[in-house]
Amino acid sequence: MTPIVYLHGFASGPHSGKAQFFRRKFAERGIAMEIPQLDEGNFEGLTISGQLKVIDRAVGGEPAILMGSSLGGYLAALYAARHAEIERMVLMAPAFQFPRRWRERYSAEDWERDGSIPVFHYGDGRERRLGYRFAEDAAQYEDEPVFSQPALILHGVHDTVVPSAISTGYAGLHSNVKLMLMESGHELTDVMDPMWSQVADFLAVPESIDRESITLSVD
């Protein structure tokens, strides 16, 4: 099966609940999933461009499937729009319109003056500083990347962080996108089994390892 790269959300990390859930599900079927640390341990210096470079190294110029949660979903779309080697994607509550919505949420003047802002980091379980370079860098990227690869979007109808209407509008404009609305919020952690069913079907994941087909040779 084509290698799978999972992109975690903003202020999260490789050990998030969804990332580990999907890693376990794929592993049970003999499929490896890579989960890069997108901030490379430097959250204050985080940028969209820097995260795209991390993805580039993980993909390595070879065919790949991208899975992304929230900001990770937006990053997956950005990357796929620029890299034809991405075969297909699974986007969970993708943070489309991220640059615009961040400009509306935070005062650029105050952020630039102070140099950084406090942000709760869910992966670390504590507050961290995020540098103004994040806002400067994000401004160069499109709100809704246009890609040609097949994509499955999973979005909670009760999402108050990234409203599901954003994904509904996006899917309505792009025939290569399949949208599944879930009875959940932004995190989607209470519908992971139904999500797995959708993901497994979309990616044509085998039910389990065919152990009878595995032979061992002894020299």
Please provide the spans of the model-predicted regions.
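Short, surface-exposed "cap/lid" segments of acyl-processing enzymes
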Residues: 1-40
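Short, surface-exposed alpha-helical segments at coil->helix boundaries
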Residues: 16-20, 49, 163-168
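Aromatic pocket-lining residues of Rossmann-like dinucleotide-binding sites
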Residues: 26, 79-83
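Active-site loop/turn elements of alpha/beta-hydrolase fold enzymes
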Residues: 35-41, 94, 184
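Catalytic nucleophile-loop/oxyanion-hole region of alpha/beta-hydrolase
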Residues: 36-59
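Gly/Ala-rich beta-loop-alpha elbow adjacent to hydrolase catalytic centers
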Residues: 67-76
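The alpha/beta-hydrolase serine catalytic core
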Residues: 86-219
